[in-house]
Amino acid sequence: MDGKGKIVIYCSASYDIDQKYNQAAREVVRAACSLGYGIVSGGTVKGTMGVVADEVVRCGGTHTGVLPGFMAEYLYPALDKVVWTDTMAERKEAMREGTVAAIALPGGIGTLDELIGTLTLAKLGKYSGKVIAFDYDGFFEPLKALLEHYVSAGMMDTGTLELLHLPRTAEEVAALLK
């Protein structure tokens, strides 16, 4: 089920996060699958990545996992397709490739790296999909404030900030994907 294309979901590998974020992740996956999108993710069983993978299976969606060989022990067993890379940099590129949107769920430093990298590529005209940070429970408000600071300091133009969508509900994410 990826008739509308694929979206990449960036998310946490941590098991220690508040479960409300995992529930929010499930809602985003259900919304994307119901609209006919295939999912691309980090492809592991760890943390929210595993939650995303489980929800794609429950929804009957298609799921491509992208991971470097050194993470093979964490491979989610029920992926439709696995893309192996040598490095984390290659992983990020392979995850984005051919997607129509990139959604960052609340996550850690890896998620932030993926989100900012994708936003940078969008600014440079090298990523044409939508860049979405799911601002569930205000999670990305500090990032928004930092980016606004960059704009006010003249380090970044407002056009870059305008490329970043910050929906607060799964319904708002779905509206951006329609």
What label would you give each PLM region?
Residues 50-56, 114-124:
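Short Gly/Thr/Asp-enriched flexible loops that form oxyanion-binding sites at enzyme active sites
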Residues 1-61:
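Glycine-rich beta-alpha loop segments
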Residues 43-105, 110:
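Acidic/glycine-enriched connector segments
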Residues 47-51, 139-148:
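Glycine-rich, charge-decorated loop segments at or immediately adjacent to ligand/cofactor-binding or catalytic sites
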Residues 67, 105, 121-144, 158-160:
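Short, acidic/small-residue loops that bind anionic groups at enzyme active sites
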Residues 101, 152-178:
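A charged, well-structured terminal subsegment
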Residues 18-20, 112-115:
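Glycine/threonine-rich flexible loop motifs
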